[in-house]
Design a protein with these regions (language model features):
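Extended, composition-driven regions rather than compact fold-specific motifs
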Residues: 2-7, 13-279
């Protein structure tokens, strides 16, 4: 049997053994937020690395906004393409109630930065045919959106000795936000994106062992061979680790199974989040 260095070794016929971090007190912790819808307006827009529209939003509704997790997601509601109107649900004691037949287009986004008062920054990945990308390309100062959330955050300690991040372009903003706070002895990034664009976007990669895996195609569950091969070469510790996986939904599931089943990692310290789904 070929043994890949890793979190644990699972041999046939034996009880699976997970080698946990020093204690579960080191596990990421969830916090909840009260759900609110907030009206925000475009304050400025800049193209970044020829791959993202960075839009700074402002508004008094941002008072009390809280985003404690580096990969939090907020729901961004876009105006009706025909009428320009924003239709929102009602928040009741029983939850969210939508008006019959009215459901605006919405997408999930990770807050890149918030000044704690009234300025929120989002990066919109530029691609063809995307509702959010198209809106961002046309956005002008004063244009209005509505956001909801984040309803909850996963607060991940910044000082795990070993940290490994896998993402495509859609996950780069979350990694950029995370990178500013990381204190790790070993930090790996495996990014399914063009190296030049990735480096231009992330800028400071000091202390990061970066692997770029762009093949000109989107991350899919059936084309992960080069990524898995690269991961096989990375020796994983038995404690003090954190692994973050994001990208296309089915691909993320394959990667999650790779770490928790093939490499024997503790699922408490493997964070797998689908950022988009192949239709």
């Amino acid at each position: 049997m070929r043994i890949i260095p890793g979190c644990a070794i699972n041999q046939p016929g034996t009880r699976r053994s997970l080698l946990r971090n020093k204690s579960n007190s080191r596990a990421p912790q969830r916090v909840r937020n009260e759900l609110r819808f907030r009206h925000i307006k475009v304050a400025s827009k800049t193209k970044v690395a020829d791959s993202f529209w960075r839009i700074v939003f402002s508004g008094s509704d941002l008072v009390g906004f809280n985003s404690a997790g580096f990969d939090d997601h907020i729901k961004v509601f876009f105006p009706d393409a025909q009428t320009g109107e924003l239709h929102l649900p009602e928040i009741t004691a029983d939850g969210i109630v939508w008006k019959e037949g009215v459901r605006p287009v919405a997408r999930d986004y990770t807050p890149l930065a918030f000044d704690g008062v009234s300025s929120l920054t989002l990066d919109f990945y530029i691609h063809e045919g995307g509702v959010a990308s198209n809106w961002a390309a046309q956005a002008q100062p004063g244009d209005e959106l509505v956001i909801g959330g984040p309803r909850g955050s996963l607060v991940v300690p910044t000082d795990y000795a070993f940290q490994l991040y896998v993402c495509d372009e859609t996950g780069l903003p979350a990694f950029k936000r995370r990178k500013a706070d990381i204190r790790a002895e070993q930090l790996h990034l495996l990014a399914w994106t063009d190296e030049t664009k990735g480096r231009d976007y992330l800028q400071n990669l000091d202390g990061v062992s970066a692997t770029w895996l762009s093949s000109g195609t989107a991350m899919q569950s059936d084309n992960l061979g080069p990524l898995i091969a690269a991961l096989d070469k990375i020796a994983l510790p038995t404690e003090e680790y954190f692994i973050w996986l994001t990208g296309e939904g089915e691909a993320v599931k394959v990667l999650s199974d790779y770490f928790t089943q093939r490499r024997g990692c503790d699922s408490d310290f493997v964070r797998a989040v689908a950022y988009w789904h192949q239709k």
